[in-house]
């Protein structure tokens, strides 16, 4: 490659994975990433402390970075499932994702990414409908702010065991979502490719 990679990509990093909170101070981490000219984007997640959140917002506003927001930790930490067949628990996950949209907007992100929850074979069809319900609600809220909602495709039978899941299932879900919301898309992690069976052409379905 003759040219810099930045000519072709916005190179970013996931803040909480590059600098795990158990080992790194959040503000120091953001400063480090923002001062590294190699990066032009950063993905952050929910910040519990209001004062710290304000400081991070200020740092990001002063930086050259495109801001992305990952809501996955907000679901995985408390064990919430956006496709939970129990309606009350599903609503809890939905509320967390709607709050994530608001926090993402505050921090300067153009949308959020999240993942589907675990599933059981005998309730898979119901779980699919529950996930549609959750995602449509979150997309409706995000659309009012001009923001995107992206579902990250994970493995369906190994580590995360997420409903979305098999690539053909992801393509079907995206098609169903796009009949009602044009601010929905799929987010694909290259490291997940081997765990999603045969991958159909659905890298990103968004406007």
Q: Locations of the language-model features?
A:
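Acidic-and-aromatic substrate-binding clefts and catalytic sites of carbohydrate-active enzymes
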Residues: 18-24, 43-55, 120-122, 129, ...
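Conserved beta-strand positions in the central sheet of alpha/beta enzyme cores
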Residues: 41-43, 113, 150, 187
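Active-site groove signature of glycoside hydrolases
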Residues: 100, 104-124, 148-156
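Acidic/histidine-rich catalytic cores of soluble enzymes
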Residues: 141-207
């Amino acid at each position: 490659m003759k040219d810099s990679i930045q000519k072709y990509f916005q190179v970013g990093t996931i803040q909480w994975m590059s600098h795990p909170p158990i080992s790194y101070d959040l503000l120091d981490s953001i400063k480090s990433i923002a001062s590294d000219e190699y990066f032009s984007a950063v993905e952050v997640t929910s910040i519990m402390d209001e004062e710290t959140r304000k400081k991070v917002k200020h740092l990001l506003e002063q930086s050259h970075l495109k801001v992305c927001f990952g809501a996955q930790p907000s679901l995985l930490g408390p064990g919430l499932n956006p496709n939970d067949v129990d309606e009350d628990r599903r609503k809890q996950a939905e509320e967390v994702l709607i709050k994530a949209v608001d926090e993402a907007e505050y921090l300067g992100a153009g949308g959020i990414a999240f993942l589907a929850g675990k599933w059981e074979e005998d309730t898979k069809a119901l779980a699919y409908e529950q996930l549609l319900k959750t995602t449509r609600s979150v997309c409706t809220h995000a659309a009012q702010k001009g923001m995107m909602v992206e579902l990250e495709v994970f493995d369906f039978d190994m580590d995360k065991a997420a409903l979305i899941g098999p690539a053909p299932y992801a393509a079907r879900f995206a098609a169903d979502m796009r009949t009602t919301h044009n601010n929905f898309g799929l987010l694909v992690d290259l490291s997940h490719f081997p765990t999603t069976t045969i991958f159909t052409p659905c890298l990103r379905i968004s406007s």
